[in-house]
Structures are given as structure tokens and as C-alpha cells.
Amino acid sequence: MAKEQSGTKEHSPMMRQYLEVKERYPDYLLLFRVGDFYETFFDDAITVSTALNIVLTKRTADIPMAGFPYHASEGYIAKLIKKGYKVAVCDQVEDPADAKGIVRREITDIVTPGVTYSDKLLDDRHNNYLAGVAFLKEGKTLMAGVAFIDVTTAEFRITTLLPEELPHFLAGLHPSEILFSTQEKERTLLLKKSLPSETLISLLEPWMFSEEQSQTVLLRHFKTHSLKGFGIETAGGNRAALVAAGVILQYLEETRQNSLSYITRIGELHHTEFMSLDQQTKRNLEIISSMQDGSLSGSLLQVMDRTRNPMGARLLRRWLQRPLKKLTNIQERHNAVEELVENRTLRESVAEQLAAINDLERSLARIATLRTIPREVRQLGISLAAIPTLQALLSDVTAPRLQALTAALQPLPKLAEQIESAIDPDAGATMRDGGYIRAGYNEELDDLRSIASTAKDRLMQIQQEEREATAISSLKVSYNKVFGYYIEISRANSDKVPAYYEKKQTLVNAERYTIPALKEYEEKILHAEEKSLLLEAELFRNLCQQIATEAATVQANAALLAELDALCSFAECAVAFDYTKPTMHEGTTLSITAGRHPVLERLLGAEESYIPNDCHFDDKQTMLIITGPNMAGKSSYLRQIGLIVLLAQAGSFVPAESASLGVVDRIFTRVGASDNLTSGESTFLVEMNEAANILNNATERSLLLLDEIGRGTSTFDGMSIAWSMCEYIVHTIGAKTLFATHYHELAELEERLKGVVNYNATVVETAERVIFLRKIVRGATDNSYGIEVAKMAGMPNDVISRAREILAGLEKRDVEIPRQKAPKVNTMQISLFEETDNQLRNAVEAVDVNRLTPLEALLELQKLQEMARSGGY
């Protein structure tokens, strides 16, 4: 701002006004209304010109300027927000004709990535979150408190995490904007590396993060003495999270979001209620987006989303990312889906009603903040009027969850009737010309309209009288905004114009006049129309405010309708795709018969059927080692099992003939890897970081899906790590594990470790080619068919032939991976050395494997190798 403020006294009055406003909003692009344009100046102009690719001009020799028409502002603002900027809109708040001196201007709106109501910015099937993060000590432990809100739906939640859990949580939440204290600059720089590049970090003053300040703001907003009524205990470890929630409300007030009364609830996100899915798992299972291009196409969500309105779509998205962990809650959803599956008439009738209901959550937010149009208000009334019909359809349901949903719905018949009587069915997309309040709703408005209408009839009468008086048959009475009402006469008839006609305008082929009688009725019409427009706007505001007083009830109905929509979506998928109801239990066993990959079977289409596969885990079978070549279906099989478990715990039926599943607390995946160049991490280090996360956090109730562990390093190093991980999982964790590998030597673990069982992806060899059957069967295989895969990929024949020669030579070598000599495995580490090598034995025994990360284990192994090469000394 220094550059902009220099020489302020030399600027024009308007520019001084601009600089005064800009000084109050230094972090925002200031859009300054000048006539029919929004203008930006100085550095803002340079930024806006570049971001929007519009012309950069100059107001004076030293003031850069860029702008765009006010009527197109929503689209331009949307582009700026998508690029991560914050925008302050400064409008003219008085008519320039009435201004004494410079026109008065005020900030009328502030838009940021996390605070926007614009349809041009929002995806109606996604939430748009604003998050706040605060750090406080609970006892001796530093905790990260997170609050997040979607201002367009009024969803407002808090949660408390350890600082190291924060990156994964925020990456999963995917907020558009995050609020931090300026005291946390270093922490935010580190955190940014794990967030999408478009996420905006807004740094606020530290005083906003005080406990006392936040508590005052929260209690004032919710008009309560405590938050216990929302199930939140201030002393229950939520101190940091409540600070973050208070910061969010302060930020919304600071950004002039004054109509916040529609935000009626705040709740705690209880992690114990949901299966934990880290970002790697969400990405690897392609739950929300495809790994190939990040789009919805090819994702689980694309397959499962048959919702009929945006509220249900947003909830279904959350369900798939937060599967349930409590058995009774899972079974409640399954039973509800089952009834909808079995009762086709009910399912189709409910779906039809849901399709007629608009987005109550976002409509309410726009109505409460007076950002709406009459047509949207009318649609909300129609949606409310549909609730009794839905209740009647659901009156005989037997599933407990459907019964609870039906009973909890609260029709608002009086409000629906008032909206119906107030808003004209033909109300347009704008309010500028009036006519959107229905006739009969307000007596004063009807009278004003009658005056205007009667006066217009009198104008037509004047037109006829003047035609007769002047004998000019083409004379006509017309209107425009500049000259008002006038009489237009062609030049050819100018000699017939009476003396009492007062000229108003001369055109090429006509003259325009007025007369006393026309002036009299013009005043009556314009006065009545002006008052009518003002009264209509007032009536509409009052109606919006009345709707806002019912915000809590409308939001409760919206949540119930969204849940019903998501359950119907699950039911429609179950019917369309031949899914089955899984049997859920509290045990750790898992049994899937003829399971299918929910996404791949849809992509294959009718011309190619998906090959189903079984999967079984119990006390005798806890780890499945799956060998076989690439393209044989190992990775797809791993993902298939993960997706079936996830769908079951989200409340859906599953793609299988039958499924009996113990509730899983977490799903971990280690499938594929790539360099993390921004953090300076190699493929192998990324792989080891992910593997370490699994080993440190998995429990007996977890499901581990591990694909090609150790392939990022040399063969022997990689195999050693894979072997050691298998031992650790079996002996220390006991989690259900699918372990796909090219290391055929790992098949030996079946004989050495209890619970390890070999499976392989079947292949049929013919004289000319290899056929991948994509069937997972019992037993191991010792052939990777890598050369055959290379041939299928189109490698030159010379390369293929030479590869066969090299492979034949390598297979003749007497190369063996060191194996344990002891008949029984009692240790957690592979025995690589003979009994006589005492020094090596002592060195190995001194290693505390329980404290080593996989990477440290690799380094320790390298030291032991060097010792072995030097003869153990």
C-alpha cells in the first residue's frame, strides 16, 4: 500500500476515497464501482489484468487501471476466486444525481474461496468448506483443534487431533480456505506441502485465537450459556477446536457475512464412529476420483451416485469417505436399503418425490443472506409442500431407520402456503422490473398497481384523443427511461403539430413531444410504479426473513431428505447391479463369495463379464500372499476386497453372491508409488513412508492391502523388507492382509508362519501366447511372465528374443536367497547367517526390530551385509 498511498493529497477525491477503503482491506482485491464498471487500481489492477486476461490501462500517467462491466461481475469474481484471490466489492450506495460531492461508497460484499454463495463457483454435489485451525495444550500434550463450515449448507463441525494427524485430515476434508494465526507461519508452510495448490491459507491476528474471545463469540451467536445442548463439552478436550470455531465466526463477521442466523447448529465429528481412511487409501481405492486423471469418471462415487438432488449427492460423498464403524448403525442402513430394494413401488415413488425437491440447504443460505431471487424462494415453498406427500408414502415402512426418518420430518404447511400466496408463478430471474409478488398478497401493492394500470389505460385514451384532434393517424404515445412518456410524430406530419405541444426530442425521421395531460398521468404512473417496486422489495425481504426464522427446521428436514436420497441411491444400485446384503458382525473374520470390483465391472460393459473371486479370512488364514504376473488381476483383486468392505460399512449392499464381514476399523493400502519431488522424496522413500504408517497404526481389526512392497529398491533389499513386514504383521499386528508380490520366494512363508496362505492369479500358456484368466486360486506360482507382458505391449521382436536369452542364462545361475536353517521360526527377523558366525549373530540379536522403521531396517541390513562381506569382522 505504500506505493498506492504516496502522494494521496495529490489524488482526486474519488481516488482518495478508493485509497481509504483499500487501506482497510489490504489483503483483498478491491472492486470499486465507477458508473457501470467495477474498476481496480494500482497493484490490484495489474493482478486482475493478468488473472482475467483483460486490458491494463491507466487512469492517469501513474495509476494502472483494469475493470469490467458490473452486470458481468459474478463471472469475473468467480474466476478470481478460483485462482485463490479474495475480493472486496465496494458499491455506490447513493444515486449520483443525489450526491453532494463524491458519491458515497461502501463495502457491500466480500468473497473468498471459503465464503461464497455463487453458483458459478460452487459445485452443487460438493461441499465448499472454510476451516479454522488452533493449537492449545491439553495437559502436557499439544492438540490441534479444527473447525469447518460450509456457509452454503450451514454444516458446522469441530474435531480435535494430534498435530501429526492434521495433514491427513485436512487433505481429506479438502477445504477451499484455512484460517491460521500469524504466529503459525512456519507450521502452515510445512502443512501447505500436503494440501492441494489451490487451497488458500488466510493468516489472522493472534488475538482472534484467544479462548475467551472465541467463547464469547460462540455463545453470543448461538444465544446460549454453554454448548452442552449441542453435545459439546468445553472441558472435554475440545478447547482448541472451540477456539477454531470462534475464529471462523469472527472471520465471517469480518467479511461482512452479517446474516448468520441461519447457522443454527454446531456438532462434534467423532472419529470413533467412522472407519479411518488416510489419503493414500482414498486415492488408491479411487473412492472419489480416478487415479488416472483425477476426474469423477472411473471412481466409486460415479458408480454409486444415483441420488436425485444435490443434498443427497453431498451426503453420499461424505458416506463413502467416512464409512461407519458401529455395528448397529451399519445394520440400520442395510435394513433401510433392503426395504427399498424389496419394495419397488415405494422406491420409485420416493425417488420421484425427491427429484422434485430442490437444494433446501443452499437455497436457505441464499434466502437468509438475501442473495436469492423470487423464483428460488417459490421453489423452496414447493419443496416444503412435498414433505407431507413423502411422509404418506413412507407411512407403512418397517425398517427402523426409515421409520425414524419419516417421524422426524417436520412439514411447514403455513410457511409453504405463505410462499405460494406471495410469489408469482411466472417470477423471472431478476427483481429489477418487479411483478414477482402475487396479486392479492398485499392490498397496498394491489392499489399501486391499479393506479399504474388505470393510468396506462388513460394514456391509451390520450393517444386516441390526440389522433382525432390532430388528424395524425400514426401518432403514438411511447415511453423510454431517459425521456419518460412522450408523443411521437413523423416529420412528414410536423406541419399538423398543435402549438400547445412541447418538443422533447428531435430524431432523424420524427419529433417527440409532451402535453400537460401526458405529464400529469406520467407523474401518477411513475410515482405508483416507483412505490410499487420499493414495496415489492420490502415484502420480499420480509418473506425471506420469515423463512430464515424457520432455518433450524428447514435444515433438519434437509438432512433427513438427504439421508433418504442416499439410501435410495444405494437401493437403486443394489437392484441395477445385482448387489447382495452383507452380513455384518463384531468378529475379525471375513468371507466373500464371488466378489466383484464395483467399478471395473461397470467399465467392462455387457460385452465382457467381470471374473468374480472369493476371499476368506479367519483364525487360520490371516494373510494371503498373492503371486502372479502383471495384468493377471492382482491389484484389481486387492482393490475389490477393499471396496466391498468399504461399501458394506458405508451402508450399501455389495457386489458379491454373499458376504459375511467383521467390522473393520481402518483400511490401509500400499498400491503403487511415485516420486514426491516437491518434498525431495524418491519413489522408494515414499513407499517406505507409507509402509511405516501402516505398521505403526494398523490393528488386529484393520484390513491391509499391500501391493509390490519393496519394488523400489534392489531385488534382495526389497524382498528382505517384504519378508520382514510379513513377519511383523503376522506376529505383532494380526491384521487381515492381502499381500500381492513378484517375490515368489515369499511363498515359503506359508510353511513358516501360521496364518499365511498362498494364492495366485491364474494363467494359461499356449504355444503362441499367455492368457490371463484373472482368477485368484489357492497355491503359489513361480513365473512372472514379464517377457510375455512386454510382448503384448508391442516391444520389438529383437528385444523380446534377447530378453529370453538373458533370462535363460540367469536362471542357470546358482543364486539363492539366504534362508533360515532352523526348523522353527521363533524370531521376527530372517536368519541370513550360519551358526558359526558369532559376531554376525550378536550383531543381529542386538537389533531391536520393534523400534525400527522399514527405512531404518534397510539401513541396518546394509550394515550387516558389509559385515558379512568382510568376513564378519
From Swiss-Prot:
Organism: Chlorobium chlorochromatii (strain CaD3)
GO CC field: cytosol
UniProt protein name: DNA mismatch repair protein MutS
PANTHER family: DNA MISMATCH REPAIR PROTEIN MSH1, MITOCHONDRIAL (PTHR11361:SF34), DNA MISMATCH REPAIR PROTEIN MUTS FAMILY MEMBER (PTHR11361)
GO biological process: mismatch repair
HAMAP family hit by this protein: MutS
Keyword Endoplasmic reticulum: no
InterPro entries membership: DNA_mismatch_repair_MutS (IPR005748), DNA_mismatch_repair_MutS-lik_N (IPR007695), DNA_mismatch_repair_MutS/MSH (IPR017261), DNA_mismatch_repair_MutS_C (IPR000432), DNA_mismatch_repair_MutS_clamp (IPR007861), DNA_mismatch_repair_MutS_core (IPR007696), DNA_mismatch_repair_MutS_N (IPR016151), DNA_mismatch_repair_MutS_sf (IPR036187)
GO MF, one example: ATP-dependent DNA damage sensor activity
Keywords: ATP-binding, DNA damage, DNA repair, DNA-binding, Nucleotide-binding
Positions annotated to bind ATP: G628, P629, N630, M631, A632, G633, K634, S635
Main function: This protein is involved in the repair of mismatches in DNA. It is possible that it carries out the mismatch recognition step. This protein has a weak ATPase activity.
Family membership: Belongs to the DNA mismatch repair MutS family.
CDD domains: ABC_MutS1 (cd03284)
Keyword ATP-binding (UniProt): yes
Gene label: mutS
